[in-house]
């Protein structure tokens, strides 16, 4: 679990959610990003867990609160609370298991049903280190991401490949949305300016400034 920071230690708090089938590596992506750890013996998450990490984005201190849940159907009852307030998501599939990729569309629909439809989403093909077992070509992931206006990266939590890049890209894009909103508010004569220090950001409140982003990959 990431360390808790008081309100005066960060400028923005962004809630991210990890979604995708059970066993695709969501928990290991989370632990790699927040603690730089990887557990080969990790078991499926039961219920909901979250961790935090604070980083600098364009000279602002951003605290990411990242939620992780099990992919099994028996945990569907937590859906609404899990998604509430999320401004970014990482949709994860396992590049060695075709079915997990085919289920990505269902996960994306559920996400958009419970959040602003323009939420910043990164499609992640995890376990890229298992090159000899790949069942989902990179081009398939790119095509789906382009079709749905998602970002896209292939990652390896085991080898720490692109893990930090994926989370950081999502957080940076959320921050840019918030910054654009603040600039537009200033241009219109609003006195609100930037959100107050430590404020939790809910992009849904200002969906008019959101744009669908094109696919990016490494």
Curated annotation (Swiss-Prot):
It is found in: Cell membrane. The keyword Lipoprotein applies. A motif (Effector region) lies at residues 42-50. GO terms for molecular function: GTP binding; GTPase activity. Its main location: membrane. SMART domains: RAB, RAN, RAS, RHO. It is a lipid-anchor. SUPFAM superfamilies: P-loop containing nucleoside triphosphate hydrolases. It comes from Lotus japonicus (Lotus corniculatus var. japonicus). The gene is RAB11D. Belongs to the small GTPase superfamily. Rab family. PANTHER family: DRAB11-RELATED (PTHR47979). Keywords: Cell membrane, GTP-binding, Lipoprotein, Membrane, Nucleotide-binding, Prenylation. A lipid is attached at residues 215-216 (S-geranylgeranyl cysteine). Pfam families: Ras. This is Ras-related protein Rab11D. It comes from the Eukaryota. GO terms for cellular component: plasma membrane. InterPro entries: P-loop_NTPase (IPR027417), Rab_GTPases_membrane_traffic (IPR050209), Small_GTP-bd (IPR005225), Small_GTPase (IPR001806). GTP binds at residues 20-27, 68-72, 126-129.
């Amino acid at each position: 679990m990431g360390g808790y920071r008081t309100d005066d230690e960060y400028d923005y708090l962004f809630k991210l959610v990890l979604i995708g089938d059970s066993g695709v590596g969501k928990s290991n992506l989370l632990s790699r990003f927040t603690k730089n750890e990887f557990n080969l013996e990790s078991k499926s998450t039961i219920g909901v867990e979250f961790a935090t990490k604070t980083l600098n984005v364009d000279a602002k201190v951003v605290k990411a609160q990242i939620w992780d849940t099990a992919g099994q159907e028996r945990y569907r009852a937590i859906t609404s609370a899990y998604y509430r307030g999320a401004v970014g998501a990482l949709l994860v599939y396992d590049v060695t298991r075709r079915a997990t990729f085919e289920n990505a569309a269902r996960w994306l629909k559920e996400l958009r049903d419970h959040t602003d439809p323009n939420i910043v989403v990164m499609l992640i093909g995890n376990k890229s280190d298992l090159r000899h077992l790949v069942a989902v070509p990179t081009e398939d992931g790119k095509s789906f991401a382009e079709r749905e206006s998602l970002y896209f990266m292939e990652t390896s939590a085991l080898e720490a490949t692109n893990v930090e890049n994926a989370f950081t890209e999502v957080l940076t894009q959320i921050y840019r949305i918030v910054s654009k909103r603040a600039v537009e508010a200033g241009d219109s004569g609003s006195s609100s300016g930037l959100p107050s220090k430590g404020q939790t950001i809910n992009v849904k409140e200002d969906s008019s400034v959101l744009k669908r982003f094109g696919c990016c990959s490494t």
